[in-house]
């Protein structure tokens, strides 16, 4: 009886842990350049060479062209994902310390038209 109770208790803890585990804020998608990180809509995510120290350097008109992958106020870092505070006070997801963005000129899933723009924008890869 003790063995069965211990197994049932362990299973309950495991299910509880899984239920409360936060999922990653990105997905992995396919593109002509291989695997890329995507947002929840499947749009390619990018990183910016001018971002430094976990801080976004893309604000104002830059952020209009390169919308940040926003994080909700109650979002929590998970695994390789962290949250940075933008100059406007908004929250943005970062992967391995690099803030993540979409590109306004990508129109469908799998597009990677922002890769290499001005030699400072690159696809985010898993």
Language-model regions: role of each:
Residues 2-7, 17-126:
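Compact beta-sheet-dominated domain cores in extracellular/mature segments
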């Amino acid at each position: 009886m003790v063995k069965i109770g211990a197994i049932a208790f362990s299973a309950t803890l495991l299910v509880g842990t899984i239920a409360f585990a936060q999922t990653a804020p990105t997905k992995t998608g396919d593109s002509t350049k291989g695997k890329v990180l995507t947002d929840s809509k499947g749009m390619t995510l990018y990183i910016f060479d001018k971002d430094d120290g976990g801080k976004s350097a893309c604000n104002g008109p830059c952020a209009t062209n390169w919308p940040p992958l926003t994080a909700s106020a109650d979002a929590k870092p998970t695994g390789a994902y962290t949250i940075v505070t933008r100059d406007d006070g908004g929250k943005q997801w970062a992967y391995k310390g690099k803030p993540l963005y979409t590109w306004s000129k990508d129109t469908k899933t799998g597009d990677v038209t922002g890769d290499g723009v001005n030699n400072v924008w690159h696809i985010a890869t898993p």
